[in-house]
Structures are given as C-alpha cells and as structure tokens.
C-alpha cells in the first residue's frame, strides 16, 4: 500500500489554495494512490533543480512535485502553478 508524506513547504502552499483546488487535489491524490501513471495525472520526471523528482497535474495549471523516498512511500514536496514551481 502506498503512503504519502507531506513536506512542510507543501503544507504551507496547500493551506493557501482555494477550496476548489483542494477538492481537485484530493481527487487526484486518490487516482495517484490507485495508479500513479494514470493518464489523467500526466506524471513525468523532472530535471534541473528537481532532478530525481516527478510531477503530476492537479488541474490544468496546478501541479504536485514529489519523489519516492522508499518503496511505496512518497514525499509530496511542493504544489503550485508551473511558474511558482519552476521559475
């Protein structure tokens, strides 16, 4: 069974999101736990400062950055828009 850990930075950004985005995140988190490569998530590996991390889509603009810490244990490191995360 997969487990998710939340980084403090993720928690701070998540707290600032709208209720609508939080609902979308919860739905996508369920998809992630069922199949992290579900096509709706658009999961892909990252490069540069996020080398070793992956990302999935919550909405068209909001993404979650995460990495697998151990087998089936995932650290959600950050959440935000493309410019917030990658600029």
Write out the residue ranges for each language-model feature.
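A short, surface-exposed loop/turn module that caps and links secondary-structure elements
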Residues: 31-56
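Enriched for short, Lys/Arg-rich terminal
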Residues: 1-4, 8-23, 58-63, 67-87
């Amino acid at each position: 069974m997969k487990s998710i850990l939340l980084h403090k930075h993720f928690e701070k950004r998540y707290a600032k999101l709208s209720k609508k985005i939080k609902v979308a995140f919860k739905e996508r988190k369920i998809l992630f736990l069922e199949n992290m490569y579900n096509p709706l998530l658009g999961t892909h590996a990252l490069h540069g400062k996020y080398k070793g991390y992956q990302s999935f889509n919550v909405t068209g603009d909001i993404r979650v950055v995460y990495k697998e810490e151990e087998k089936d244990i995932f650290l959600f490191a950050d959440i935000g828009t493309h410019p917030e995360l990658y600029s």
